[in-house]
């Protein structure tokens, strides 16, 4: 069983990337489970025809963990992709990472981990104990960073590199960075900047996903791009990402940058703007 986790800043496109990746993988004849590890609980929505499935944490609160079965928490989506949403606490109460911990404990008790590949879609703004659990407990052995060329997105990706590096010091866990996915925001020299960042931390870009309105059209139809526009160039990009991940053998313990190094790197790839807002 192959277990991978996609980490990145909130709003960067992790869930869109994860759902299209899962769709591409199941189209290859693999059995796939996608686990959304974000309180927004929308990771699997496009695999479920737009349905927001009940979260594990909500079900535990409502019915008690001991009363739940596998069919209560695992839902079947596009072409058989098995979908799970960890969920989070009520606003202003508790720890968001708790949903991930509770979900994994329940899925283990119910013997749910038996797919060819499991895709964890994980919030990466704050890599606290709960959100780091897929790495810390050895569930996800291959980590992929989803980022754009925006500084805050790169900052989150760099923090995840710090978490991987720290967790990898525990010889009992095998947790490695498999590559960087550039989800473009159409910034100047964005692919070069993200490629330079990947190189600096010891890794590489494994996919460049261009910004496209096709994603919005697909999601308005409650579908992934893979399902909505299977012959499009964007669909081919997601299929290529699936191929890269399935054949990847290049895994590293990353070397995170200091914040000053990261900012210097970002500045070197952005156009100079004077006090009047004019590019040079």
UniProtKB/Swiss-Prot annotation:
Cross-referenced SUPFAM superfamilies: P-loop containing nucleoside triphosphate hydrolases
UniProt GO BP: nitrogen fixation
Post-translational modification: The reversible ADP-ribosylation of Arg-98 inactivates the nitrogenase reductase and regulates nitrogenase activity.
Residues bound to [4Fe-4S] cluster: 95, 128
Comment on bound cofactor: Binds 1 [4Fe-4S] cluster per dimer.
Function description: The key enzymatic reactions in nitrogen fixation are catalyzed by the nitrogenase complex, which has 2 components: the iron protein and the molybdenum-iron protein.
Protein name: Nitrogenase iron protein
